[in-house]
């Protein structure tokens, strides 16, 4: 079933004309919640803390830690990448995503051994780092580390500490694969959870040792778009120009206008365009049309600029 779903996800991405594709994370039921099944040293939560009422982040519970955190069989990303390699057609580049340790730590309950979220993060860091190292060894040439918790709580946390955590996590892959960081403000059940403050992340996040920084922009109405000028001087700026939380399907012309706005702050060779976040909470029909329109809109501007 997972293979069939992956084939469908690949087909949809290719049909839209994407330059880089993934497996659609079809082996996961969430971008990060599935990973707790690979951990030893925790008790999986028996039931969500809230079942009824509107869907939201408080329906995700936390798993108690019972002993040292380990992942003796890895975190599953390598097998997912190998399946993508086997199923993908020639042409588009392949990318794999993995949640970072700070984001993963958010669903685990502190205990005497790991008294706070940062202690849990430090325990998870080598597990994620090992998975990244194994992905590179398996031939993965682009890895996106998802750290939405860092962007959600950047306004109140020590950003230099975030940068140190992130850079130590990706260290085995620096200069060995293209490294991306994804930042957003939450998308569980299509709901945001962060304060949506982008400027507070800079200039500290410019010290992240990545090739591409992906930032949710559409849901903030592009109010902080000028930050991509700073970003593009250090790395590629991947701008979220599709709202994955809305069922309004942006037209190619609207996308083209957003691309033109980005070009006021960053050169074309430093810009990447993507949805704000993953499309796991978006119906397939809407996701397909949004992706197709995104590509068409970008191509309108490419043609205008002779790119």
Where are each of the predicted segments found?
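Domain-level signal for soluble alpha/beta catalytic cores
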Residues: 1-307
